[in-house]
Structures are given as structure tokens and as C-alpha cells.
């Protein structure tokens, strides 16, 4: 089998890339480890999408997605103009529909098990194997797939039982795994590993969250209570949208604001219902077509040291700790929040919400100076004004730095510096730690995937 484009990871950026490449006529294969698409939006319950610049580019996928969701009641536009409020369950259905409409082939429960590479030779340098300009650059020739749910990693067993095990040729391979698993498999360079070696005390990760949903909430009563308690409309807002109550509120343990919810959380801590760590970050949003539910962007999981999202031992402990925290929060909320008297936990995310993990070293390393200066590029894939948003495990150390001007990201920050036809999209792009803190949001990941698809569609054979 031959494809123009194979995308590993049917998440935020991967779905955008697949949909647009399919619409542009590229033969596209999208492979996904789960049994549904959406990545962090569905498996980690990351909803809503944050608002970004109205001047953003490569927004066809975002607009089509939200329009399709709205048709089945799975999307609303919030009062601030943010169209990115969505229902994560209906998103799964909508993404299936969109991939079919774009003629994208999708394989669930699948992974890439083998990658065949060769030295890169174009028409001008076929006889120049020893040329300094190309001697370190390679080319992805073909890949082999296998079932992601295999629990015994034995090639002999796989070859007998798995019909997926055949080589697939592709012009381009795109890593949309979030953790740059394809780059890792190919032993590519990573900025986070380089930075760690240079500055041992430097933060290279951010705390993770385990999101959850509570249902059975009287949203009208909660809305009345929270808007009377908190008059800061930069923190707490509530509106009737399409006949339903929609709202958002927040609290952190930082002292940068006179948080209205601080006395409430303090009382919960004093009663022993929650710990101080449980209260370090709290944020809630309503969900379209889930009229008695709230999505929680918490608990934020902190520890004495940075935890690498790739560390299975540490993240396993973190998941169990997080679920215990969710249980404590639910008891606290039922006692102290009006409208929560009969509320219950209805969903806990299948995966941790990861803000940053592996970051590739690409053709161009995008820096915080590029972002702050609004540096222009020949091949931008997005335009944003979202702030540099870096969460800390320490009190009063998180930053939310708004930018005075818009910034853009070049396609070259998505391209491998080692392989001619290998790209990464999503949170694992080639950007330094601070810049990545602004680029990781859903709309920007959509634009990365779409921008790359359009760029590749314009390239020759």
C-alpha cells in the first residue's frame, strides 16, 4: 500500500492534518492508539478550547468541526466570542463523520511497529552520498503497523495473528502522538533532553492535570450563588446561551488575586475534606448539551520534583493520587457549593492532561524571543496572541504572560532536522520551554496540523 501521508496520532493536531490533507486530495492514513479520535479533547476531557487571535490562519478545520458539532447540539459560542466550547462525547462522533467525508482512512487500536529509512537523495545529489549537506539527512521510506492492544511484544506471535503487519509506503510521515513517539523510535534529538543536560535545575515539564466531570448539578442555583459571591468578571461569568446556563469560574492557591473562593476552600481544608494540594488549581466550565454537568480542569498534580510524562512508574502513582483527589473534591463540593447537593462524579479522564513532554529539535527552534518580538516567517502555520501560560508546582510561581503583539510559528519548527519527510505537530514541536507554553492550546494545534497539510499538498513529488 502507498500513501501520500501517514499520520500517527488522531488527536487535536492529527485530526486537523488528516482532514485537510484528505480534502486536498492526498491519500491519507490516520492511525490512532485508542478506539476513538480526539486525543486530549476526548480522552483527557480537555474542554473547552481556549480563545485565541481572531487573525489566526489555517482555521478551516476548526470552523468545520464547530459547525458540525453545532448541528447536533455539541457546540456553543460563549459570550466572549469563543466558538470552542464543545461536548467531548459528541466530538468523537463528529470526528468520525468528518474523516469519512474527507476520504481519510482511519485505523484504531493501531501503532507503528517498524520504520524503514534510507539516505535522502534528490535529483540533484543522487551521486553525492558523501556530500556534507546531505550526509546526516535521511528519508522515511516505509512503515509497518501492528495492533496497539497486543500485550505480548513478540514478533513471531504478531506475524501469525496480526494481518496489519505489512509494509506501507508513504511520502510523508507525521508524528501527532503528543509525546513525539515516532521521533523517539528513530532516536531523534529532543530539546528537553538537551536543555536538561545544559541546566540541571531548569524546568522542562509542567504539572499535569486529571480532568473530570460532575453531573446532577443545579446550574441555575450554582450560577446565582457563584456570581453573587464573585464579582470579578475576569474570573467568573455566567450567561444564558441557546436557552441554557453556561458559566465558568476559577480559583488558585496563588496570592496574585483576591480570589472570592479562597474562604470556601480554606473552610474545606480546615474541616479535613480536602488538602491544600487539592486546592492548588480549580477551574470549571459548562458543557454543551450536558445541562446539569460541569467539566473540571483540575486537580493539578504537584510533587516535589518535575515528573516526566513518559515515566510510567511515576505517572501510574500520579493517576491513583489524582483519582483520590477527585473523590475528596467531590465531597467538598457537595458540602460547600450551592447547587451541588446531589452532584456526582460522572466521568474521569482516561488520560492525564499533559501540558508539555518531549519537544523535538527541528529545522528551526522557535524561541521565546521570537514570540515576544512577533518575528515574521516565510511559511507560518498559525497566528496567535495566547499568553505564555506556564504552570508551576510551587505556590506563586505560575506565570500567565500576555503578549503585546501577535506572533506566528514557522513550518520549519514542525520539520525534523534529521529526516527529510518527517514532521511533528501538536505540543511536541521544536520550541523552547517558554514558547511552547503559549503554543500548546487546541486552536494552535489545529492550525499546525492544517498548515502542515496545506504545505505538503503544495510540494512536488
Q: Model-flagged regions — what are they?
A:
Residues 1-11:
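Beta1/beta-strand and adjacent pyrophosphate-binding region of the FAD-binding site
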Residues 6-8, 22, 170:
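Membrane-embedded transmembrane-helix bundle of lipid-linked glycan/lipid transferases
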Residues 10, 33, 427:
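Cofactor-binding loop segments of dinucleotide-utilizing enzymes, especially the Rossmann-like FAD-
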Residues 14:
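N-terminal Rossmann-fold NAD(P) dinucleotide-binding loop
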Residues 20, 26-27, 32-114, 118-134, ...:
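Conserved N-terminal/central alpha/beta ligand/cofactor-binding core
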Residues 40, 133-139, 148-172, 176-461:
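Flavin (FAD/FMN)-binding glycine-rich loop and adjacent Rossmann-like elements that form
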Residues 143-145:
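SH3/SH3-like beta-barrel fold
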